[in-house]
A protein has these predicted regions:
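Helical hinge/lid and interdomain linker segments adjacent to catalytic or ligand-binding clefts
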Residues: 1-70
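Intrinsic-disorder/low-complexity, polar/charged segments
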Residues: 13-14, 110, 226, 257
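A glycine-centered loop/beta-turn motif at secondary-structure junctions
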Residues: 24, 40, 46-54, 115, ...
């Protein structure tokens, strides 16, 4: 059709269409992505790209589970990142999200998890909407991923408590290339890119919804960000910053004078 927008699949039909973008935000589309190309996404990430994907975009990392499409996840993704389950989920109430404070597969501190907890504490995001003190309220959780101790490439950031389906990974990240070799001096691998998977709907919090049925700007309320939005804000800041190993504490920013 003349003058019609290009198909969204044209974005990922070749790596050169992805490389102009610093970050890709893949927001849930209500089903597994049609005709995705995980291999091209991996090429983009391995070259230093960043990806934030939510809910049904798990199919980029796991391959399609329920849609019976033909594309597959790269061999070093899939079950190397997490244990995956398909579907949309039907839990729209608030559950508690536990901030992960230790590195996956060890008892060593996860410095960025500690920073996330401090951020959420300082912004008043924890213990809201009836969840336990020190936990993040999560509306519309979706239970598609579990990062286990054998999933060495991945780091869980927030895990569901027993008020929902306990032990499900609500946020996790992994650096790329997944199989990057350690440096010659035995230090951390030279990672280039980073991906974050968010298994929830940020807009699920009722406080984010416009119920006035009026057009902007009259319907725009000057209210605080929801707890989930504050967590999202932190994750986007981290995603867009320099890639440093999860074992390293994030540097302290220098205030602009």
């Amino acid at each position: 059709m003349a003058n019609a927008p290009e198909s969204d699949t044209n974005l990922w039909d070749m790596p050169s269409h992805l490389t102009p973008y610093d970050i890709l935000l893949l927001s849930c589309e209500g089903d597994e992505t049609y005709n995705a190309n995980p291999q091209n996404l991996e090429t983009y990430l391995n070259a230093g790209g960043r990806v934030f994907a939510s809910h049904f975009h798990y199919s980029w990392f796991s391959g399609p589970i329920q849609s019976m499409q033909a594309y597959t996840a790269p061999a070093d993704w899939g079950t190397n990142l997490a244990t995956w389950a398909g579907g949309g989920g039907n839990d729209n109430n608030a559950i508690g999200g536990i901030i992960d404070l230790v590195l996956n597969g060890s008892m060593s501190p996860f410095p960025k998890g500690v920073s996330l907890q401090k951020w959420l504490t300082d912004t008043g995001a924890l213990g809201q909407n009836g969840v336990a003190a020190g936990e993040l309220s999560i509306f519309s959780p979706r239970y598609n991923s579990v990062v286990g101790t054998t999933d060495k490439a991945s780091q869980a950031w927030i895990t569901s408590d027993s008020s929902g389906m306990a032990g499900q990974t609500m946020y996790f990240s992994f650096d790329t290339p997944v199989n990057a070799m350690a440096s010659a001096d035995g230090g951390a691998p030279a990672y280039c890119g980073r991906a974050v998977f968010s298994d929830l709907h940020v807009a699920g919090d009722p406080s984010t919804k416009d119920t006035t049925n009026t057009a902007p700007p009259a319907s725009c309320a000057d209210t605080d960000l929801s707890p989930q939005e504050k967590a999202l804000e932190f994750m986007l800041f981290d995603l867009s910053s320099c890639v440093i190993p999860d074992t390293v504490a994030p540097p302290i920013g220098i205030p602009i004078q």
